[in-house]
Structure formats: C-alpha cells, structure tokens
C-alpha cells in the first residue's frame, strides 16, 4: 500500500466505528406498544434517533506497526557553529602514492661525444664474379714527371784562354739554353709604401656567435635577499561561484538572499586606529614557563634608511654575470708611421756567374754559433785597388797631454756656431694643455695598410745547445736531388744575445789603406792621472789691481786637532817657593821597609816656552778623528764699515786671457738652473754615414716609430734589477667602484711624453711616498769609474731569498792587499727556511737574572740580507791604499744617479712671505675608522598611523633560576591509589651468591609437546671437526627439500631405476605461522637528575604514571602485628647450573616444524659410477634443450647450369661510377630560397675591436646591506594566536613510592605470542615416515658449457643472419655436382626432445653388488662433552718493536714537524684538508696519512668521464690546505707561484708502537690521558669545516686529526685549479666549545666572542698513545 493511502484508510476505519457505536441505542426505541396488548413490531423500521451523547474516550489502542517512511521534510536552519574540536593526534603516515605521470619530454640533449670506434666487422662472404664492365673514359693527361737522374759526367773541357789579371776570362756567349723549370715562388718582398687611404667601408655584418665560454666560478649556495615587492597584478577572471553559507536568525525569507560575491576590490586606505580594547581576562597570576622558540617570523618591513655604513669587507664571490652583448666595432686605427728602409745589398761585379743550380730548400735561420777558433794565417793578399777604404773606428781618447805653451791671444770673443748637438733627453711631462676643439665626426674607416717594418731588434742571447744528435747513416749512393723548395718559412725568432767571445788572435798586418776622411771630433777625454810636478814656471805677469779687503768672515768651524809637535827643550828651574810652615819635631824612628811605588804625580805647571825647534821631517801623521761639533763662537763685535770702493773705470775690453789655472776643486752643487728656452733645430744636410761609435757611448736616439708586431720571442732570462723608481704622485681618489672580482688586468700602453713644464716652487717636504712600481729593467751598463761613496740610500726592500750557501769555514789566510772594487754581484738566491724548533717551555712573566757570557760561538753562516740601516755617521777616512795600476780607459758611463743632498747649510735670513700656494690635491680617502661605541638610545620615532601587526619579537633571554623553596612539612598518607597497570619488568637485580652445587637430579618427565621451533639463522660454517668414530647406521631420513639449483654436473652415464613409478601428488602444506613480533629496544641509561626548580602551581591530575622502580629500603619501623599471608615473592636469581640430570624419557613427537631456509648450494658432485642395468625402463626423460646450430658445411661442387630465371628484384645500390663527362649547361634554375642551412662552426676568434664609445651611465647601484638596526619600540599587542600544536611530552615525573603488592587479579587474556625463543636442542630421531610423494618436475637446468672437441679446422663464427629475402622463382634443376669434401665435425647438438616412451624392454639380469658408497655427510652435533681439566700455562707473549700504527702530525707552519718521542717518521709533506669537485666536498682525516701529500699543487686531482677522457685543472674545482700564520696580502689579491710556499702547512707521517687517540675535555683545561697512556701533543678540538657552496667535511673526534696544536679562526686556505689561493669570507671552521658542566641540559646562551678571547671558549684536547709494557 502506498504511503499516500494510509491516512485515508485510518479515517475510514474511525468513521465506521463511530457509526456502529451510535446505532446500538437507537434500535431499542423503534417499537412502542400503547396498551393494546402485545404488539408485533417485527420488521418496522423506526425513525432515526437523536444524535447521542459522545461516549467517553476509549483506552489507547495497541501501538500500531510503524508506518511507511514519510516524505523528507524541508531543510532546517543551519545550527550555530560548534566549539572547535581538539586538535587530533598526528595521523599515521599515508601510503606511498602511486608513481606520478610521466613528465613532458625533456629538451633534446646536446649531441653526445662520438662513440669509440666499433670492432671490425666479420669478413663478409666473397661475392660472385661480376660481369665485364664497359670500357672506361680516357683519363686526363698526367702531371709532368720528376726530372730524371743526372747523366754521366762529360769529358773534361779544354782549358780556357784568358789573361791572368786576377779576373776570370769571360767566354763567348753560348747558345740559348733550354728554358728552365718554372721557378718556385720567391720569398715575399718587403711591403711597398702605404697607399692613399681608401674611402670609408661599409659596416661589416655582425660576426657569428662565439663559442660557449668556460664554466664560471661555482656560486655559493646562499639564499639571496628577498626581492622587492612586485607591482599589483591585473584583476583575474571571476572565479567559480562560491557556496553561500549564512545563519537564519528570523523567519526564512527568500528575498533575503544576497547575490554572488563581487570581485575583490582594490586595497582600501588604512583605517583610523580603533579604540583600545578591554583588558584581557587574567588566567592566573603566575607567569607561565617560557615557551619553545616560535617559528621564524615573517621578514620585517624595510626600516628607515640607516646611516651610511663603513666600507664592508670583501664580499663573497658573486654569481657569474650574464654574458654581455657584443660590443660595437671599434673605429678604424690611424695609419702607421712609415717603416725603416730595408737592408742595402751590395753587388760585387767580380763574381763569376755560376751554372744554374737546382733551387735549394731555404733552411731556417740557425741560432748564432759560438765564436770559432782563429784560423791559420792567410796568404798575403795582392795590393788592394785604390778604392777608399772603410773608415776605421774611432780610437780611444788619448791621455791628457802636458800643458801647452801659451797661445797667441784670440781674435774673436764669439766663435762660429758649433755642430748640431744631440737631441736632448725628453723633458719632464708638461702641464695638460687646454681642451681641444671638438673634432669632426668621421666615419669608421677600415684599418690602414701595414706600416713599414720596424727596427731590427738586438740579437738575443744564444739558446742552450741542443742534445747531441744521433750519428747519421753513411751515404752509400748520394744521387739525391734537392727537392723543390718549400714554402718560405716565417722569419726565425731573434736569437738571444750571445756571450761576448774571447779575444781573437791578432790578425796579420793588412796593406796600408788610403787616407780616410776627417773624423768627427773625439769626445773629451777622462781626466788623466795627476802628473809629476812641473818645472818652476816663469815669473807671471803683473796681476790686475787687488780689490778692497772684505769684511771679516764668520768664525769658522773648529779645526781638527793638529799633529803632535816635537818635544820642546827642557825649561829652566822654577822660581824659589815661599817657606813652608814649621814642622813638628820628628821622632827618630828606625828605617822602614821600602814602600810601594807611589802613584804618578800631578803634572807640574807649564814651563816657559822654549826656543823654536827646527822644522820636523817626520812622516805625515794620520788625520785625527772628526772632533765633536764645537760650541758656536760668541758673536763678535761688528767690524767697522769699509771705505766705499771707487767706481770701476775699466772698459769692456778684456786683457788677454791668462794661462789656465790648475783645475779647481769641485764646488758645491749649484741650485738647479731654470729651464732654457726650447732651441730651434733646423735639420742640416744629411752627412755621410758615420762609422759606428764607441759602443754604448752615444746619446740614446729618439724613440723610433712603432714597428709591426714581431713574432713572439722566447722567454728572456730575467733582467737585472732596475733602479728603484721614484715615488709616484698620489692619484686622485676614484669613485668607489662596484665590488669586483680580483682579476689580472693587461698593462696599459705607455703615454706619450708631455711638454716640459716650468719649475714650480719648492714644496714642503712631503711624507715618504709609497714605493713606486719597479722600473723597467735597464740595459746593463758597462762598469764606470768608481764614483765617490754616496751616503747610504733609503732602506731597500730585502732581496729575494737566496739558496743556502755552503758554509764550511776554511783556514784563515794571511791578510791580502786590498783588491780593486769588483763589479756588483747578482743578489744571491733565497736560502731555505731552517726547521722550526720544538716549542719551548713557557717562561715566567719576570725577566730572569742575566747569565754569564757564554764562550764565543763558531762563526755562523752569513744571514740573509737585511734591510739597509739608517744613514750612519760619516766614517773616519781609511788608510791610503797603494796606487793601483793604470786601468784602461773605460767606456763613457751613463750619467750617475742623483747624489744625496749635501749637509744642510747655515740657516739663511728669513725670506719674504711667499705668494699663496696652489691648493693641494684632494687627499686619499682615509681608512675606515674603528667601530664606534654604541650610541645612546634614540628617541622614539614618529608613530605610525597604520597600526599593523608587528613582527613577532625574538624570544627573550631565559630568566634566572629562582631560589629553592623551603622544605615542606611531611604530608598525610594519601588514599590508596587505583590498581596500577602491569609494571614493566624491573631491572635485573644483582647476581645472588653462588649456590651450592645441586645433587644430581632425577630423570625428568617427558616434556609437553613443543611448539614448532622457528627457523634459526643460518650459521657461519664451523671449523672442520675431528674425524668421529664410525656411528651406527642411522635410520633412513626423510627426503630433503629441493635445494637451490646447483651448477650442472657432468652428464652421467645412463642409469637404471627399479620399478619406480610416479606417485600421486602430495597434499598442500600447512599455512605458515604469523611472523614474530620484533624485539623491544633496550632501555636507555637514565640521565642525571636535574636541579630542583621552584614549586609550580598545582597541576591538573596527570595520567597514571608508569610504575616506578623499587625504592631503597626505609628505616626499620615498629614491630607490627602479624600480617596476613604474603603474596608470592618474585622468583630468585638464577643459581649456578647443577650437574647434568639423567636423560629424560623421550617426549612425544613434536609438531611439524617450519620449513628450513635453503641451504648454501653445495659443490658439484663427482661423476657417479656407471649404474647397473635396471630391471624396468626408466620414466620418460625431460625434453632436451634444442641443439646448437651446426657449423657451416664445405661448399658443394658446382651444379649444372640452370635455366634463365625470371628477372629478380632490384639489387642494392652499386658503388659510385666514375665521373662522367661534363654535361651541357643546364637551364637557369628557379629562384626558390633553399631551406636554412645547418648552423656553421663557430668562427675563429676575431681581433679585439677598438674601444667603443662610452656607454650610458649605469643604474644607480644599491649600497651594501647595512648592519642590523637597533631594536625598535615594542609593537601593539597582537591578535590572539591560533591554538598551537600539541606540545612535546613532558619530562617523566619523579618516581612514586612503591605501592603494596596487589591482590592477585583475574587471569588475563591470552597474551601475544612471546618473543622468539632460542633454538631448541635437536630432538631425538622420530619414527621413519612414509616415503613422500614425488615432487613436480623441475625446470630444465641451464645450458651446459659446450664440450671441448678437437676439430680439424676451426670455422669462423657465423655472422648475424641477414634479412630474409623474397623467395625467388624456382629454377631449373642444375647438373649433378661432384661430391663435396667432407666438412669438419660440427659441435655436439643439444639433446633432442624426449621421444615417446618405448615399449618396456625385457627384464635384465640381476646386477652385481654395488661398490662401497662415499662417506656420508657429517651427522648431527653431539651433546656437549664434560668440562676438561685446565690446560698448561702458555708461554708469555713476546713484544715487538713497531706495530705499524700510523698517525700524522701537522705543524700549521712552514716548518716540518718532528715525530713525538717513541715514534719514528715515515715521510713529510703538505697538509691537505679536503677537496671539492663538481660542487661536492670530500674531506681527509687529519690523523691519517692521507692528509699529508708529499707534493703540493693547487689542484691535486683530475676527473675522468665515461668516454675515456680525463681533464686536469680545466674547471672550477677547489682544494683546501691547512695554512700557516702568514698574513694575507694587503690588497687581498690571490696568491700564486712561489709566493704560496709561506702559506701552506707542513706535516709528518709517524709510526708508533701502539694506537694513538684524541681525548677532548670540552673545557679550557687540557684533559689527562687515560691510565697507561702517554701524551704525544696538546691542542684544540677541531671538528668540522665548510667553504664554497656550503660544502665541507669533518674530523672523527677519536682521531689525532681532531686535535690541532694551534687554534686559528681561519685554519685553512682555499686553492683553485687556475693556480691561485686566497682566504675567502665564506670559509668557516667549527670547533668543540668549552662547556660549563652546570649548563648541561639547558638552553645554550648565545654569545659572540671577538679576537683575543677566542682560546677561552675552545675545548682543549690531548693526543695519547698506549704505553708499551
């Protein structure tokens, strides 16, 4: 019934019941009798009665059946949101997702390297013979053949007729010769003069893209700064319609629905600050425990710009920049200056023209050979022709002549103009000229023609002689012809300047030459030696009248003391003195002993002067030492004024000049003169070529024009050190550039010299400038005459370290005469640094008492050249040496260096005040100052109107530990707790005392059925046991499980089986038991108890704690009442094992055990004996493996010729034919652009372009990130945060007091299966089982190796099968062939498939008894035997010397460290810390010998790839080495070459008798070595290091390498494959810190420690070695 009809049906029932009830009383009123007797009222229906009173409500009916399901009601209003649920526990890790879809195909890879060449293919079959081809085209005429060999030598000709005049007679002209071969191209001529400049060319097309650059530096894996906020994006498309959720608070009205949510509006302006909220609820007055540090907050807003920071340290290497665009092509260069004319060739007319020879190969220019020995004297030549001879060289200047007679008076005062002087040396650069007018814009022109060749360079130093060549083979038939000349070679490099040859033997005297032309006047000669005194001269002419006497001069300096005069004559007796006082009367004593000699008496008064003695003639005494500076004399009275002189009346006519006086002494150096005007130098007519002057005496010529670029010369030998350059002027401070990578720039081109400037006023003495750059090495000068000794110069930089000289002091020689001054030697090479001494014991702070002077030491080796000392006082003049021999006149020396300034003159009078000086140049930027003190706290900044939520502040420091609370009173006993959980097993108690040995036990009862044992772990094969006694024959075992497939044994002989037929298949095995539950991990060691904290607030009741350990026994209480019966006690500790009991009865047979693991495959069995013939045929064999393909047979004989076949398929493409004849010209092709060609190879590298125009100004660079700003004021209170994650579990509570043992509970549920028990002893042998069913047929075994067959001829391996061809038409049968040669035996085929079973054969006869079988496998292990008696005492072990325990010690200096006492060195080397290749680091343990490489290089490794290619130092890999305390250079430039040696630490590998370990204290105290260990060294605990790309490695703390003897914040240096090393700011070292033991298990306090206090926070350590006993 439908649900709609159910209510109608109920209404119908109710109406029916009401009608029935209403009808019953109406029926009794229908018939009324009114006294007329009995009426029969049957059948009359009365009227309808009145409506009755409604009856009382009936009882409720029975509960009806549930009606059908009603219609779904309307959706109710949404309920109010529920309270947020608690955060659920962390979910279980989800199942690993399905593998993702395959990604889009990657970009095509770069083409791989060409693979290695494949193996040669197998030789193909011989093809069939082809048909005869068409005749070929006639070939092109061949090249002319080589000339044939020379013909036989002709007969000797007749003698020529001619006159013997020294000329060869010239014959008649011969017949015209055969035209010669075409000559080979001659050497290229000299370049012609430059043509006129061409018109400007068009701009060239841009060049092809260059090859990919080398791999850049590895970037550091650092996170970049947060980028700037991007611009607001465009409004996105409208999203999908959202779900509207709202809460009805009033009757539902459809009109209350809102439309869809509009797009998100633009961000509004910040609103005004809201009113301050009500105070929050207080949840307890106590401050909570500090929370865990929160997650990292969002990055803060940019603060106000700070003050400019100081210049930062050098930054890390940046990422490699993007590749720049190609620069604009440079402008066309200027036309080069014209070159010098080429060498002049002279034509000698007297040479006879020879026959035309074959052109020879032009040989390369050989190196200049050494001077040969002088040849024998030649035959005297015939008299020379009277041609003018070459001008001889200018002779040496003659000696100074004696003084000539007085010459006649000169005629003119002014002489004729002298010859044109040499051009002066270039003056100092002049001031910069005014800016020029702007130049015209010129188009870029193509580069000009090459200029003329430049001057020929000086000849180079001769190269070293090559090794001696192999002796050539003797020439047997030398009919060789010179080959055609090759292409002319490049001109050879100029040879190195040769060593001057020895003096040659004087040649024979030549014929007298014709007189030469007048030579140039010679240079002024050097002053000659002082002549002997001349004869007395004639009386001189009357001098001119004397001048007036001048004013008296200033008193001179005090003179040197004079020589000691001769003794004067003794003076006369002195005058009589006055009478003395009266003496006391003397006692008459006896004569005394002679007294000692008295002291010398005082000098008497000086006597009167004696008469003058005769002049002394003693030898001249040595001048005394220079006296001390005298006291300046008293200023004398001013002298009287002299008379005014008469005016001079002399006329300008001078008298005749007097004789030249003797050369005066050199006057003091005058002031520098003013520069003269620039002289005009009209060029004179060119004179004849002069002869070469004295070598190196002429003035240097003007610089020649720039020559063409020569071929690169060989590397020259190092030049002599140049003079120290003058200090350069300080440059203008440049704008600070962006931080660049250190690079090596190319040297700039030298500028042109400026015009000479006027001499400026002398400035004040400036500070000493930085040393200038070293000058270019000068050409070494010839030795000049010794100048006067100069004052010591400025201290020079120390010379390069020389190699250590061998210093063996010889016997002392006699004093030699003073030698001549030798030439200055080259500075010696730097000696090796001596080894570093062992560190001494630290001395006390006080200085000790000075010791006695030691004995004089042996003279030491000469030390290194120190820096020149300060200027010393002038020394005393030395003894005059004997006159040297007269030397040869030296070459004209170069002008000497400027002498030192003279002694200061007396101070002049004060000059007038000078004019105002030019303002000085801007000083260089000072070094950044030291970091200032922290400033006072600033005022609060202006309030921000937008009160956005501030960033989360950094966690505050941990508060101090509070004082411990007072001890509380003892509490009342608590209520008994609920029944505790089952406790964890307690810790094992201490072992009890050993029990008495038990008596021998009774035999045990049979045990219960054991559980099936679990499978044991496969044991290690034990050692081979002794051979046991022969056991009784065992019962037949069960058939074993199928083993792993062993290797296929040799094929046995065909066996026999007696009537075994396959049984039915066995039942399916039992399902295996569930796997074991894993073992519970061991309990960790309890930590030490922490300090008691202050009492916290009452916590919520905790969850029931884990039962505690049993407490210690308390004090004895009062005797209690007798207790109830106690609970059973815990089991006692296990006693000692009793004697073994009697063997128990055998238990019932256990259940079937699990299947054991597969056994280790056994070795292949030996070949069995041939079985006897069986009675029944065996079962059907397994199908054999198909046999290998047989060898190819010998080809058969040829058959009869077949019929002509149908035309076959088109054959493969034939080889290319010969070139055809040229065809007729084709029609003009259509102009269709072809497809774009492949990309060409990258072009050759072009010449560098000229510099482009300056680019536009770059963007304004951002400054370096400033220091962290000061902490701002606290932000407004943040909104309440979301509920945090569930905190970590708290620390375990203190152990509770142990509860009373509970009443024994109900038996628990069955427990989990227990931990897997140990393997039980093997059970006794069970009864023999029934034979098992035959297992299923196994898979066929692997194919056996082919047997060895002796074949007659080994056929080649067959090639791979070709593609099957189309079947051809069937040909006619050929003729019968001859029988073929039998082929070699093929290899044995694989066994064929099993044949169908044959019919059973007849029963065989009974076989003989089989041979004795081989020894069976060893039986089960027996029970362990009884304990044996103790053995005899062994011999004591012998000690050894060194056991080969290796460790490495690093000095962290350039000294090689010594091995500690008791160890010996193996080798020394350089300290390698770690390497980094392909951005991955690999470290070395500094305690092992792998960290001590015997050779140092900045790139000690290379890398190889799968293409058999290895690359060395060709990409950006690194190596890191322990470094020394040497400071890095001031300019932070990378270090390379020999300059690296002072930066690399040395190391020694040592061998000791025992193991070496490192012990770390984690404090600043040095830890002691363990007992019976000795100390090797002490140091600092080094644990880890990182550098480029945050890659690095670490040290094992047990290794001696973790204990470095010296602490450095930067203990290692970074080196690169390009040969440079440096320290970089991203290198970090990690050390163990020193810890306060009271701070364990607490939050570490952050701190920063600066240099000077670093050793106070580093853990100390000691390396120890076990003692030898």
Swiss-Prot record:
ATP-binding among keywords: no
Lineage of origin: Eukaryota, Metazoa, Chordata, Craniata, Vertebrata
Cross-link S-Lysyl-methionine sulfilimine (Met-Lys) (interchain with K-1650), where in sequence: 1532
Quaternary structure note: There are six type IV collagen isoforms, alpha 1(IV)-alpha 6(IV), each of which can form a triple helix structure with 2 other chains to generate type IV collagen network. The alpha 3(IV) chain forms a triple helical protomer with alpha 4(IV) and alpha 5(IV); this triple helical structure dimerizes through NC1-NC1 domain interactions such that the alpha 3(IV), alpha 4(IV) and alpha 5(IV) chains of one protomer connect with the alpha 5(IV), alpha 4(IV) and alpha 3(IV) chains of the opposite promoter, respectively. Interacts with ITGB3.
PANTHER family: ALPHA2(IV)-LIKE COLLAGEN (PTHR24023:SF1090), COLLAGEN ALPHA (PTHR24023)
Keywords tagged on the record: Basement membrane, Cell adhesion, Collagen, Disulfide bond, Extracellular matrix, Glycoprotein, Phosphoprotein, Repeat, Secreted, Signal
Stretches for region Disordered: 44-473, 500-1439
Stated family: Belongs to the type IV collagen family.
Stretches with biased composition (Basic and acidic residues): 255-269, 922-939
Protein name (database record): Collagen alpha-3(IV) chain
Signal sequence extent: 1-28
Coiled-coil positions: none
Cell compartment(s), UniProt: Secreted, Extracellular space, Extracellular matrix, Basement membrane
UniProt site (Cleavage): 1424-1425
Protein modification: Prolines at the third position of the tripeptide repeating unit (G-X-Y) are hydroxylated in some or all of the chains. Type IV collagens contain numerous cysteine residues which are involved in inter- and intramolecular disulfide bonding. 12 of these, located in the NC1 domain, are conserved in all known type IV collagens.
Expression by tissue: Highly expressed in kidney and lung. Detected at lower levels in heart, muscle and skin.
Record remark on domains: Alpha chains of type IV collagen have a non-collagenous domain (NC1) at their C-terminus, frequent interruptions of the G-X-Y repeats in the long central triple-helical domain (which may cause flexibility in the triple helix), and a short N-terminal triple-helical 7S domain.
SUPFAM superfamilies in the record: C-type lectin-like (SSF56436)
Tree of life domain: Eukaryota
Gene: Col4a3
Residue numbers spanned by region Required for the anti-angiogenic activity of tumstatin: 1478-1556
UniProt-annotated stretches for the region Required for the anti-tumor cell activity of tumstatin: 1609-1627
Sequence segments annotated as region (Epitope recognized by Goodpasture antibodies): 1425-1443
Annotated spans, Triple-helical region: 43-1436
Protein's organism: Mus musculus (Mouse)
Gene3D superfamilies registered for this protein in UniProt: Collagen IV, non-collagenous
Transmembrane residue ranges: none
Phenotype upon loss of function: Mice exhibit normal pregnancy and wound healing, but consistent with the human hereditary disorder Alport syndrome they develop a progressive glomerulonephritis with microhematuria and proteinuria.
């Amino acid at each position: 019934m439908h649900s709609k009809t159910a209510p109608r049906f109920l209404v119908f029932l109710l109406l029916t019941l009401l009608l029935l009830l209403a009808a019953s009383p109406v029926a009794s009123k229908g018939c009324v009798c009114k006294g007329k007797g009995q009426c029969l009222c049957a059948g009359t229906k009365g009227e309808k009665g009145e409506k009755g009173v409604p009856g009382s409500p009936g009882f409720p009916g029975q509960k009806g059946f549930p009606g059908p399901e009603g219609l779904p009601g309307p959706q109710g209003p949404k309920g109010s949101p529920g309270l947020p649920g608690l955060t659920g526990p962390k979910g279980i890790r989800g199942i690993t997702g399905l593998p993702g879809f395959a990604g889009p195909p990657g970009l095509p890879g770069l083409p791989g390297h060409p693979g290695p060449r494949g193996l040669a293919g197998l030789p193909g079959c011989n093809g069939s013979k082809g048909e005869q081809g068409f005749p070929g085209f006639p070939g092109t005429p061949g090249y002319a053949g080589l000339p044939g060999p020379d013909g036989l030598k002709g007969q000797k000709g007749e003698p020529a007729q001619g006159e013997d005049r020294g000329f060869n007679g010239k014959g008649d002209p011969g017949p015209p010769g055969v035209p010669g071969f075409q000559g080979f191209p001659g050497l290229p001529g000299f370049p012609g003069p430059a043509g006129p400049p061409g018109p400007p060319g068009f701009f060239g097309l841009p060049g092809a893209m260059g090859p990919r650059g080398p791999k850049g530096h590895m970037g550091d894996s650092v996170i970049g700064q947060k980028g700037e906020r991007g611009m607001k994006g465009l409004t996105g498309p409208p999203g999908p319609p959202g779900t509207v959720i709202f809460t009805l608070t009033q009757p539902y009205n459809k009109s209350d629905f809102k439309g869809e949510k509009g797009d998100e509006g633009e961000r509004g302006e910040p609103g005004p600050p809201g009113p301050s909220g009500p105070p929050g609820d207080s949840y307890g007055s106590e401050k909570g425990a500090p929370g865990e540090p929160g997650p990292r907050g969002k990055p803060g807003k940019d603060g106000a710009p700070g003050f400019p920071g100081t210049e930062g340290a050098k930054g890390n290497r940046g990422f490699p920049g993007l590749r720049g665009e190609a620069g604009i092509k440079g402008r066309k260069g200027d036309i080069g200056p014209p070159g010098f004319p080429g060498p002049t060739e002279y034509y000698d007319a007297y040479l006879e023209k020879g026959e035309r020879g074959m052109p020879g190969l032009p040989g390369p220019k050989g190196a200049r050979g050494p001077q040969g020995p002088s040849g024998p004297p030649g035959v005297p030549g015939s008299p020379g022709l009277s041609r003018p001879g070459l001008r001889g060289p200018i002779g040496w200047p003659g000696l100074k002549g004696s003084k000539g007679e007085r010459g006649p008076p000169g005629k003119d005062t002014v002489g004729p103009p002298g010859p044109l002087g040499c051009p002066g040396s270039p003056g100092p650069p002049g001031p910069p000229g005014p800016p020029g007018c702007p130049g015209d814009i010129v188009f870029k022109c193509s580069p000009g023609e090459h200029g003329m060749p430049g001057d020929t360079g000086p000849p180079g130093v001769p190269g070293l002689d090559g090794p001696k060549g192999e002796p050539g083979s003797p020439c047997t038939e030398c009919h060789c012809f010179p080959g055609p000349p090759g292409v002319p070679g490049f001109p050879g490099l100029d040879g190195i300047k040769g060593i001057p040859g020895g003096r040659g033997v004087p040649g024979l005297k030549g014929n007298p030459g014709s007189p030469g032309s007048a030579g140039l006047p010679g240079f002024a000669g050097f002053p000659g030696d002082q002549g002997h005194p001349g004869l007395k001269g004639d009386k001189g002419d009357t001098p001119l009248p004397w001048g007036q006497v001048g004013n008296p001069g200033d008193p001179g300096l005090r003179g040197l003391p004079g020589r000691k005069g001769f003794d004067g004559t003794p003076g006369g007796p002195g005058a009589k003195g006055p009478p003395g006082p009266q003496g006391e009367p003397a006692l008459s004593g006896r004569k005394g002993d002679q007294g000692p000699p008295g002291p010398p008496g005082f000098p008497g008064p000086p006597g009167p002067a004696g008469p003058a003695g005769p002049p002394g003639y003693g030898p001249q005494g040595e001048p005394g030492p220079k006296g001390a500076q005298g006291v300046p004399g008293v200023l004398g009275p001013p002298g009287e004024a002299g008379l005014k002189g008469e005016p001079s009346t002399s006329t300008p006519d001078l008298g005749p000049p007097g004789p030249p006086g003797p050369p005066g002494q050199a006057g003091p150096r005058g002031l520098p003169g003013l520069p003269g005007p620039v002289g005009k130098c009209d060029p004179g007519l060119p004179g004849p070529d002069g002869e070469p002057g004295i070598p190196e005496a002429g003035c240097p010529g003007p610089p020649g024009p720039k020559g063409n670029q020569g071929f690169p010369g060989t590397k020259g030998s190092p030049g002599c050190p140049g003079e120290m350059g003058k200090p350069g002027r300080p440059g203008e401070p440049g704008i600070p550039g962006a931080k660049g990578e250190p690079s090596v720039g190319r040297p700039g081109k030298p500028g042109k010299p400026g015009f000479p400037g006027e001499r400026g006023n002398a400035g004040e003495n400036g500070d000493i400038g930085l040393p200038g750059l070293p000058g270019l090495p000068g050409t070494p000068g010839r030795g000049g005459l010794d100048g006067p000794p100069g004052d010591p110069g400025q201290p020079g930089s120390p010379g390069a370290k020389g190699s250590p000289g061998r210093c063996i002091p010889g016997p002392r020689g006699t004093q030699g005469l003073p030698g001549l001054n030798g030439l200055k030697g080259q500075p010696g090479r730097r000696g090796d640094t001596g080894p570093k001494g062992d560190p001494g014991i630290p001395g006390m702070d006080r200085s000790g008492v000075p010791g006695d002077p030691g004995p004089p030491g042996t003279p030491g080796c000469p030390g290194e050249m120190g820096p020149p000392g300060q200027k010393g006082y002038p020394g005393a003049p030395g003894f005059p040496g004997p006159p040297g021999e007269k030397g040869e006149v030296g070459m004209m020396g170069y002008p000497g260096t400027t002498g030192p300034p003279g002694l200061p003159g007396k101070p002049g009078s004060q000059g007038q005040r000078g004019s105002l000086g030019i303002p000085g140049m801007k000083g260089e930027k000072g070094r950044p100052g030291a970091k200032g003190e922290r400033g006072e706290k600033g005022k609060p900044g202006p309030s921000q109107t937008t009160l956005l939520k501030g960033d989360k502040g950094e966690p505050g420091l941990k508060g101090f530990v509070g004082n411990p609370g007072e001890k509380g009173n003892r509490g009342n006993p608590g209520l008994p707790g609920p029944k505790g959980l089952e406790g964890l097993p307690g810790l094992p108690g201490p072992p009890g005392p050993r029990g008495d040995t038990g008596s021998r036990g009774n035999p045990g009862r049979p045990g219960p059925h054991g559980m099936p044992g679990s499978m044991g772990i496969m044991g290690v094969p034990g050692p081979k046991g002794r051979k046991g006694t022969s056991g009784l024959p065992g019962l037949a075992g069960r058939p074993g499980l199928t083993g792993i497939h062993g290797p296929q044994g040799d094929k046995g002989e065909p066996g026999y089986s007696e009537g075994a037929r396959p049984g039915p298949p066995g039942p399916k095995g039992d399902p295996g038991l569930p796997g074991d539950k894993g073992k519970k991990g061991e309990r960790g060691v309890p930590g030490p108890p922490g300090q008691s904290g202050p009492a916290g607030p009452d916590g919520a009741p905790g969850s029931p704690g884990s039962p505690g350990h049993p407490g210690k026994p308390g004090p004895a209480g009062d005797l209690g009442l007798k207790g109830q019966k106690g609970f059973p006690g815990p089991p006692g500790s296990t006693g000692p094992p009793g004697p073994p009991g009697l063997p128990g009865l055998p238990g019932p047979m256990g259940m079937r055990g699990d299947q054991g693991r597969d056994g280790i495959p056994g070795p292949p069995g030996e070949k069995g004996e041939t079985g006897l013939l069986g009675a029944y045929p065996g079962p059907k064999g397994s199908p054999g493996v198909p046999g290998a393909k047989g060898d190819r047979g010998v080809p058969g004989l040829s058959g009869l010729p077949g019929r002509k076949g149908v035309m076959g398929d088109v054959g493969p493409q034939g080889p290319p034919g010969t070139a055809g004849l040229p065809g007729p010209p084709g029609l003009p092709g259509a102009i269709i652009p072809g497809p774009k060609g492949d990309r060409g190879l990258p072009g050759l590298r072009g010449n560098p372009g000229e510099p482009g125009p300056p680019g536009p100004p770059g963007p304004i660079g951002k400054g370096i990130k400033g220091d962290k700003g000061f902490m701002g004021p606290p932000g407004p209170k943040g909104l309440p945060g979301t509920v945090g994650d569930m905190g970590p579990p708290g620390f375990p509570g203190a152990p509770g007091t142990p509860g009373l043992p509970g009443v024994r509970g109900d038996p628990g549920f069955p427990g989990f299966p227990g931990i897997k028990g140990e393997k039980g002893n093997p059970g006794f042998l069970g009864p023999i089982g029934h034979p098992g069913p035959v297992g299923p047929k196994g898979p066929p075994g692997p194919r056996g190796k082919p047997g060895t067959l002796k074949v007659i001829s080994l056929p080649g391996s067959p090639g791979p099968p070709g593609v099957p061809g189309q079947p051809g038409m069937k040909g006619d049968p050929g003729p019968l062939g001859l029988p073929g040669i039998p082929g070699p035996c093929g290899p044995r085929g694989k066994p064929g498939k099993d044949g169908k079973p044959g019919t059973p054969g007849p029963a065989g006869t009974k076989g003989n008894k089989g041979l004795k079988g081989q020894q069976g496998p060893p039986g089960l292990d027996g029970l362990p035997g009884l304990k044996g008696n103790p053995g005899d005492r062994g011999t004591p072990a012998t000690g050894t010397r060194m056991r080969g325990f290796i460790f490495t010690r690093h000095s962290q200096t350039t000294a090689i460290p010594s091995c500690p006492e008791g160890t010996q060195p193996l080798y020394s080397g350089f300290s390698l810390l770690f390497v980094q290749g392909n951005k991955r680091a690999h470290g070395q343990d500094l305690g092992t010998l792998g960290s001590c490489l015997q050779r140092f290089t900045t790139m000690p490794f290379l890398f190889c790839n799968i293409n058999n290619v290895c690359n060395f130092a060709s990409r950006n890999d690194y190596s890191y080495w322990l470094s020394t305390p040497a400071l890095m250079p001031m300019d932070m430039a990378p270090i390379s070459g020999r300059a690296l040696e002072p930066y690399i630490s040395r190391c020694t590998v040592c061998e000791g008798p025992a193991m070496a370990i490192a012990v770390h204290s984690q404090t600043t105290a040095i830890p002691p070595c363990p007992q019976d260990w000795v100390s090797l060294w002490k140091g600092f605990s080094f644990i880890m290091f990182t550098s480029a790309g945050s890659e690095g490695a670490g040290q094992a703390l047990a290794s001696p390498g973790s204990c470095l003897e010296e602490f450095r914040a930067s203990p290692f240096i970074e080196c690169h494959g390009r040969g440079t090393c440096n320290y970089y700011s991203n290198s970090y070292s990690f050390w163990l810190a020193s810890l306060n033991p009271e701070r364990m298990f607490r939050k570490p306090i952050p701190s920063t420690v600066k240099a000077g206090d670093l050793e106070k926070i580093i853990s100390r350590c000691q390396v120890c070695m076990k003692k030898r006993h």
